[in-house]
């Protein structure tokens, strides 16, 4: 791929429409982020063990037995779980949860996430009245610029590869299946970061850091979604839509960190910047 090819692409794009499309995308992304039970509403991160523990803001004592989360409700406590209204005194055992999966319970308006991350079973309450969510005023971004959009190619591995990466929480690791790499050119340099499977069939995402990380953008990671390659393996890599992961906003997230080859040596002055505040940090 040549620099001239990228310039031809830029010249063919209606810049005003490009900016409008980016603005509409950004507004919708912020709307999803501020959902009353989204990550900005998480009030704590709790790792379950055999030792029962009370969790602030939700009923019961919580523990782990044979890989299953258990909640022990006292007299007068109630919880909605597995389609049932549970009333104490009662012991409820949740089904086993697969890695990166989870189930939800409810206590009034508080949603209770029971999930498995990095081999650990965790509980995270999500309260729509949480102060951090109420005070959130948006994420700063770079202005959209076509110089940070490039055409690239997806190069599939012969077989998908399991890639182990670190996590925002010390001591955790995540294992993701990677179908291949995405190769593209930015400002005369070629990059081939490892890609992972996205939410939509055939789509991809890239975890990365760059020379702006820890300066104007979040230090640990950002993520870029990439639409499914076409029949010839072509993809569009648009860093204007690079976003923060939940760990940029809260200490109660277990987000994955980029593999070493995705630490890009160029400063990508595009996409979301470091959030203004972070939930759970000491003032």
Region spans (language model):
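Actinobacteria-biased recognition of intrinsically disordered, low-complexity terminal regions
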Residues: 1-16, 281-283
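N-terminal beta-hairpin/loop module of FHA
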Residues: 30-59
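Forkhead-associated
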Residues: 48-100
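Broad, structure-driven detector of short, well-ordered beta-strand segments within folded domains
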Residues: 59-67, 109-116, 191-195
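Protease-labile, long low-complexity intrinsically disordered regions enriched in Pro/Ser/Thr
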Residues: 78-124, 128
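Surface-exposed beta-loop interaction hotspot
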Residues: 108-178, 185
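Acidic/His-leaning functional-site neighborhoods
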Residues: 183-230, 240
